[in-house]
């Protein structure tokens, strides 16, 4: 009898010990996250892309012949050299494969900074580029940059007639038939293509040595892997015709088109936050004004140029340029994590963040989205500090859910109106196929991805599984069900038909199938789909099956490759482990051994600051082209998962009662 009592006592003590360890881990992570809150209540973490944005920043300064900032250039040079891959070139993600365009830009920037072409790292880069056929294999965006520096001719890039700005909406190509990011990038680029300016480039730096042939002999790019041969040949023929007749267009027509592009740009100038609030259109806008003869003091050029410098992250030894900033996204996700963690410090901090978000809601401006939804009232949030023309559905859904949770769980008032307008806007932005896209509605002109300019395959913003899931989650958390709401019913049907055979869902904005599956399982759970539904069972089984031996989860960017649709193994990361845990718990699997092992992994890898170190990229800008490392993901997502685990284990229901 004594031995039985002793065993029971040991088991109880062990459980207490595990509970204390978990609670300590949550407390440390909470404290760590709170330390990043800004004085006005919001959070904003670094948002790092690959080497291309800092390289382009260096090249922009030399294009414009700006005074050389040797200290800043030295720091950017240190960054570029550090992220060079073992293969000699530069990757799109940490430890990733060689990428030609990234390598060409990084090499060019380092040479511009002053690195000798005989330096070992430059020799390795050049040899890696040569071994893969040379810089002729650069993508379209890189070729435009090379044309502007006079390294290749304008015959090496697609024709982008500025007269496109004058086409009616019913035409096959219209500026509002492509995504917001493509639209804002292309409008100033079309002006540049019309004027064909030459970089000032005071040092006269070139990179002819990266080519295996005379770069001025290079013609157009070949068909990209994602493109249909028939469509591509059609558009390639059209490009050839335009190349002949474009010089014959009336000058008055060209002037009117340029004026239309200028009006479009200046209406969306957006102060120091910049047009589109992302680097590429902002840089193109500055170069456009330069080509038009507007000096550095011209107000629209000057304000945009100041905005670009606000994207810099400058440390003691290194510096880089962010593609954009993510304060709304960081703030609402951190608030979710803190609400899950609870406590007398976490909840007030979350409220402070949510209060900061209230005036960030766009209630007046009808952005580009309204072209297809003119009768829908504005009500969304943008990703950045200010981006009135381009709110997004993902941010809006997540903000609404965090505010609703604060209202519901803590009786806080003042969010009702914001929630109602956000809900109204999201309901009005559902696409005809039942899904939701990030910024637009019914952006389904897939044939446009076959034009020569679209070698990146990211010209459109169609509905995706992850954004659809977030919108379904939000509507369901607000009380709608598939029985009471056509929006929810159509959204769930969209998710049901987009599940992959092995059980996963694609992740457009996070890497990749782990992210998509987390998003969808949260939505299905909130929408009332039974946990024994084969759709949920298959997804949960798949997640458990891909757990790494160390207890964590990881996935590589290679999973986005065109010839393979499925998860690609990778070392465990804190953020991807957190998504997998949150997904399994949404599926009712809090007691699954895989969940316990995942929690153990997070606790074991927590650092002395209570947070997690994560070098790998786990987010996506454009699949196969551009990836992101949110520095906040490894901070708030693991906290969220650990707190969710504790909360579910302390209840009898074991059911997640919120949309995320």
Swiss-Prot record:
Domain of life assignment: Bacteria
CC per GO annotation: lipid droplet; plasma membrane
Q: What is its EC number?
A: 4.2.1.129, 5.4.99.17
Q: Which UniProt keywords apply?
A: Cell membrane, Isomerase, Lyase, Membrane, Repeat
Q: Which SUPFAM superfamilies is this protein grouped with? A: Terpenoid cyclases/Protein prenyltransferases
Membrane topology listed for this record: Peripheral membrane protein
Catalytic-site annotation from UniProt: 394 (proton donor)
Name of protein:
Squalene--hopene cyclase
Gene for this chain: shc
């Amino acid at each position: 009898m004594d031995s039985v009592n002793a065993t029971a006592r040991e088991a109880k003590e062990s459980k207490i010990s595990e509970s204390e360890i978990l609670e300590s881990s949550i407390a440390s992570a909470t404290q760590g996250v709170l330390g990043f809150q800004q004085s006005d209540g919001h959070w904003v973490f670094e948002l790092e892309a690959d080497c291309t944005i800092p390289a382009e920043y260096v090249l922009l300064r030399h294009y414009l012949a700006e005074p050389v900032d040797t200290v800043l250039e030295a720091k950017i040079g240190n960054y570029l050299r550090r992220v060079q891959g073992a293969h000699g070139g530069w990757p799109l993600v940490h430890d990733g494969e060689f990428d030609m365009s990234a390598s060409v830009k990084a090499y060019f920037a380092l040479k511009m900074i002053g690195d000798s072409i005989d330096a070992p790292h430059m020799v390795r880069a050049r040899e890696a580029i040569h071994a893969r056929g040379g810089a002729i294999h650069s993508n379209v965006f890189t070729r435009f940059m090379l044309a502007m520096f006079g390294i290749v001719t304008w015959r090496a890039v697609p024709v982008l007639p500025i007269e496109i700005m004058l086409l009616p909406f019913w035409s096959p190509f219209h500026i509002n038939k492509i995504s917001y990011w493509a639209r804002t990038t292309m409008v100033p680029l079309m002006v540049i293509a019309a004027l064909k300016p030459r970089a000032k480039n005071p040092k006269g730096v070139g990179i002819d040595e990266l080519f295996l042939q005379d770069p001025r002999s290079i013609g157009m790019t070949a068909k990209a892997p994602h493109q249909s041969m028939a469509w591509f040949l059609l558009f390639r023929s059209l490009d050839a015709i335009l190349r002949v007749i474009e010089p014959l267009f009336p000058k008055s027509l060209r002037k009117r088109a340029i004026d239309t592009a200028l009006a479009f740009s200046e209406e969306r100038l957006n102060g120091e936050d910049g047009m589109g609030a992302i680097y590429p259109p902002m840089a193109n806008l500055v170069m456009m004004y330069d080509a038009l003869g507007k000096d550095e003091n011209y107000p629209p050029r000057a304000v945009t140029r100041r905005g670009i410098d606000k994207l810099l992250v400058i440390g003691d030894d290194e510096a880089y340029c962010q593609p954009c900033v993510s304060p709304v996204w960081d703030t609402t996700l951190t608030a979710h994590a803190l609400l899950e963690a609870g406590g007398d410090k976490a909840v007030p901090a979350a409220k402070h963040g949510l209060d900061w978000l209230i005036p960030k809601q766009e209630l007046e401006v009808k952005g580009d989205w309204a072209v297809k939804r003119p009768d829908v009232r504005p009500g969304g949030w943008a990703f950045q500090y200010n981006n009135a023309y381009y709110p997004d559905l993902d941010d809006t859904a997540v903000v609404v859910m965090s505010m609703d949770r604060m209202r519901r769980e803590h009786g806080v008032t003042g969010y009702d109106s914001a929630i109602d307008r956000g809900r109204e806007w999201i309901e009005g932005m559902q696409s005809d196929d039942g899904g939701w896209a990030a910024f637009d509605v019914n952006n389904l002109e897939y044939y446009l991805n076959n034009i020569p300019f679209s070698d990146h395959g990211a010209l459109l913003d169609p509905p995706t599984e992850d954004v659809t899931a977030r919108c379904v989650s939000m509507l369901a958390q607000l009380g709608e069900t598939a029985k009471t709401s056509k929006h929810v019913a159509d959204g769930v049907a969209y998710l049901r038909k987009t599940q992959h055979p092995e059980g996963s869902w694609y992740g457009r904005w996070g890497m990749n199938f782990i992210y998509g599956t987390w998003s969808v399982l949260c939505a299905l759970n909130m929408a009332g789909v039974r946990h024994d539904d084969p759709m949920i069972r298959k997804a949960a089984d798949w997640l458990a099956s891909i757990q790494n031996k160390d207890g964590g989860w990881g996935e590589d960017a290679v999973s986005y490759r065109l010839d393979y649709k499925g998860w690609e193994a990778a070392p465990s990361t804190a953020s991807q482990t957190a998504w997998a845990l949150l997904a399994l718990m949404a599926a009712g699997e809090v007691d699954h051994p895989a969940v316990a092992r995942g929690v153990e992994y997070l606790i074991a890898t927590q650092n002395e600051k209570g947070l997690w170190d994560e070098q790998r990229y786990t987010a996506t800008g454009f699949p196969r082209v551009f990836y992101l490392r949110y520095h906040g993901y490894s901070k708030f997502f693991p906290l969220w998962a650990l707190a969710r685990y504790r909360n579910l284990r302390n209840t009898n229901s074991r059911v997640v009662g919120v949309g995320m």
